[in-house]
């Protein structure tokens, strides 16, 4: 993902990422808004962090900068489309990840690796089985990502005007990212619960409405947010590791910190993979909270798992330390292309918006 060097802002100022939202999206958003909206609003990002790029008037529009007239709607649409595409393309791998994180899987659902799991699911359960629950994921990802972008962009500018008038504030970036993540995860968490229950082996749910109705009637509305705090807790270390790894790799692959798509994709993908592997224990706990495997764990616990602490204890009681890293392979494999997909979509929108704006200006 495009996490160009921003001094301290590249790490501390980046927005946090959610489960249904890759860290690459958040990183690219930070770089995108700082380059585009920050300049349009009077922020001096380029002068503060790196020398301005001199552009030949005949070379066409500046590919790195959004037009000054970019609106909140632009960020909402770009975020929604990128989020939906990312989740849809990688959904089969996400299904495999969820199953591999099961603490006590059915003998027919024990997989050695991602490819074997995907092949067996298709062969024994049907071609479209890995896609079950995709509709609720896409429905949740669109509004969640749009809300994230709109909140981050608006709050970042508002706080920057208060903290550092006329410039860019890393504190404002961090605060805006935290608030945006709270809203994003609040919108996405119910969809995550339904999606993961439909992904499990022998899931009794074939339709989203059946799953929603059963969860509501049997466990109450709170079940849709049982993993919310765990999700938020996972995002903080995930984002920190992601940015630190990215900056380290950029120092080697792109020491001049110029616009270099290949270095951004490679660094972002590697950083996402490292962060995904490191935070897998929290993801396992989140999956347990969402799927509520207590029915299969009656020999160890009674009742529902109510929070992150009880989820951590249950995972250890059932599978030991190694259980915290169930599905790590699938999680890493999912994260690498997800980062590239999100980055590519944002770059496409950025280029398209800039090109059309320049064409409109030229035609005036």
UniProtKB/Swiss-Prot annotation:
The UniProt GO MF terms for this protein read: ferrous iron transmembrane transporter activity
What InterPro entries does UniProt report for this protein, alphabetically? Mitochondrial_sb/sol_carrier (IPR018108), Mt_carrier_dom_sf (IPR023395)
Record Pfam families:
Mito_carr (PF00153)
- What is the reaction catalyzed? Fe(2+)(in) = Fe(2+)(out)
Which controlled-vocabulary keywords does the entry list?
Answer: Ion transport, Iron, Iron transport, Membrane, Mitochondrion, Mitochondrion inner membrane, Repeat, Transmembrane, Transmembrane helix, Transport
Looking at the UniProt entry, the stretches that span the membrane are 72-91, 133-152, 170-189, 227-246, 261-280, 327-346
List the biased-composition ranges (Gly residues).
1-17
Q: What is one process in the GO biological process aspect for this record?
A: iron import into the mitochondrion
Low complexity bias: start-end ranges: 18-27
Give residue ranges of the Solcar repeats.
70-158, 168-252, 259-352
- Gene Ontology CC annotations of this record: mitochondrial inner membrane; mitochondrial membrane; mitochondrion
Role noted for this protein: Mitochondrial iron transporter that mediates iron uptake. Probably required for heme synthesis of hemoproteins and Fe-S cluster assembly in non-erythroid cells.
Give the family per the record. Belongs to the mitochondrial carrier (TC 2.A.29) family.
The protein here is known as: Mitoferrin-2
């Amino acid at each position: 993902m495009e996490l160009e060097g921003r001094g301290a802002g590249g790490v501390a100022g980046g927005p946090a990422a959610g489960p249904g939202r890759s860290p690459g999206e958040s990183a690219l958003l930070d770089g995108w808004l700082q380059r585009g909206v920050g300049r349009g609003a009077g922020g001096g990002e380029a002068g503060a962090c790196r020398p301005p790029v001199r552009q030949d008037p005949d070379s066409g529009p500046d590919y790195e900068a959004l037009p000054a007239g970019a609106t909140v709607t632009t960020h909402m649409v770009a975020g929604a489309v990128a989020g939906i595409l990312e989740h849809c393309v990688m959904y089969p791998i996400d299904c495999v990840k969820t199953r591999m994180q099961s603490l006590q899987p059915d003998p027919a659902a024990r997989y050695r690796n991602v490819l074997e799991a995907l092949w067996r699911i298709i062969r024994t359960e049907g071609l479209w089985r890995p896609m079950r629950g995709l509709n609720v994921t896409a429905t949740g990802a669109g509004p969640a990502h749009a809300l994230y972008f709109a909140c981050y962009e608006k709050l970042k500018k508002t706080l920057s005007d208060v903290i550092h008038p006329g410039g860019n504030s890393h504190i404002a970036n961090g605060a805006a990212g935290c608030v945006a993540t709270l809203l994003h995860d609040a919108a996405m968490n119910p969809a995550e619960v339904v999606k993961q229950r439909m992904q499990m082996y022998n899931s009794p749910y074939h339709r989203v409405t059946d799953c929603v109705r059963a969860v509501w009637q049997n466990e109450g509305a709170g079940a849709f947010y049982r993993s919310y705090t765990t999700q938020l807790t996972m995002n903080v270390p995930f984002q920190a590791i992601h940015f630190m790894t990215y900056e380290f790799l950029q120092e080697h692959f792109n020491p001049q910190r110029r616009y270099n798509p290949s270095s951004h994709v490679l660094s972002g993908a590697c950083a996402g993979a490292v962060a995904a592997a490191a935070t897998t224990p929290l993801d396992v706990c989140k999956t347990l909270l969402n799927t509520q495997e207590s029915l299969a764990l009656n020999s160890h616990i009674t009742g529902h798992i109510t929070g992150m602490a009880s989820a951590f204890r249950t995972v250890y009681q059932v599978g030991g330390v190694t259980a915290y890293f169930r599905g790590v392979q699938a999680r890493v494999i999912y994260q690498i292309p997800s980062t590239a997909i999100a980055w590519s979509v944002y770059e496409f929108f950025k280029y398209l918006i800039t090109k059309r704006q320049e064409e409109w200006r030229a035609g005036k």
